[in-house]
Amino acid sequence: MDITITPLASSTLWSADITPTTCSENLLDWLLDQNSLTRKLQALSADFKVKVRQQVTLSHSKDLLSPYFSEENKVLVREVLLVCDNKPVVFAQTEIPFSTLTDQQAKLAEIGTDSLGTFLFQDPSMRRDKIEVAQFPVYSAVHQLCIDLNQEVDFPLWGRRSLFYVNNKPLLVSEVFLPASGIYLP
């Protein structure tokens, strides 16, 4: 069986440096917000849900996955859409090394349609590393996803990613704001 994940880590350049002139102030607020994206989206919509696109185990591949876990033999990759009022607004991809999936963190592999953000932000041991941002050019894999979701777009999209630590065990969360998110409006 062929497994195809959206190559977020390998398809663009991620950077912790972003200037206000690079994007709008509204977009910057969304990209650099350290708080729970789940809570923010829930506050802005009447109906919030998580739609799991896929969850797969991969042997580490530098072509598909981030360099953060290159020493890991296996990584769990979870791809979801965050949906507000029946519109997908964020595509999220999480990389969880198998070494993280021990003890209390083993349940990360079984959260299904529950929000990972809710799990993370309720855990008192959680800490978040710096936020990195990336711009996805037109014709990228992310844009193909938008077409598949009937959200065609002719401008670059933005995403962010952070390493999170739960009981000092790492996982990487990447989030791309889709056109229906409304954050690209002036």
Curated annotation (Swiss-Prot):
EC number: 4.1.3.40
GO MF annotations, alphabetized: chorismate lyase activity
Metabolic or biological pathway: Cofactor biosynthesis; ubiquinone biosynthesis
GO biological process: pyruvate biosynthetic process; ubiquinone biosynthetic process
Catalytic activity: chorismate = 4-hydroxybenzoate + pyruvate
Subcellular location: Cytoplasm
Pfam families: Chor_lyase
Primary enzyme class: lyase
Function: Removes the pyruvyl group from chorismate, with concomitant aromatization of the ring, to provide 4-hydroxybenzoate (4HB) for the ubiquinone pathway.
Name of this protein: Probable chorismate pyruvate-lyase
Species for this entry: Psychromonas ingrahamii (strain DSM 17664 / CCUG 51855 / 37)
Organism phylogeny: Bacteria, Pseudomonadati, Pseudomonadota, Gammaproteobacteria, Alteromonadales
